[in-house]
Amino acid sequence: MDVEVNYSHAYLLAEDDDCYPDGMLDDSPTHPVGIIRVEKGIAFLITGLHTGTVSFTVAVADQDPGADLEGYEDIVEISFESPSAYISLYEAGGAGVHGIPSLSAGPGTYRFRYHARGMDAAREENFSDVVIDHYLLQIWPALHSDPVVLKSTSSYFRYWLSAG
């Protein structure tokens, strides 16, 4: 799906959470992953493009679908606590809302694996209505575990990783 971003982000909200994030959520203090930050019912997804159109794919599965290590430059994982089986992808500022398949195990703990491709090229362009960067968010039920960086290639990802 094409998603409009402003200020290099989009976010997920659980259906019963009507509060948009006030600003950037904090990264995990013990295991930073840079480009995704979570609190209960909210996930803040950082993109390379500052303003314009990015490509998002969200895949909800019953079990770990496996990372796409060849197709993406940067890949991170983090646990997410959802108070609802229903979440949506919101464009920055709530301008647009994209439905996502319901979470297979209902409310509970899930693993998010966030893949990114083209962040450096998108950051150089900064503004674009043509898709430059692509994102895949895989979601499946899992016990809580520490955040982890599976693959780190882009300099923009490394910037966010060090920004904490």
Placement of each model-derived feature along the sequence:
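Generic secondary-structure microfeatures
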Residues: T47-L49, V60-D64, F80-S84, E91-G93, ...
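Internal, hydrophobic beta-strand segments that form the core of beta-sheet-rich folds
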Residues: G106-D120, D133
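Extended, solvent-exposed segments with strong compositional bias
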Residues: L69-G106
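Primarily secretory-pathway and cell-envelope proteins
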Residues: M1-G71, D120-G164
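Short connector loops at helix/strand junctions that flank enzyme active sites
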Residues: K40, T53, S84, P107-T109
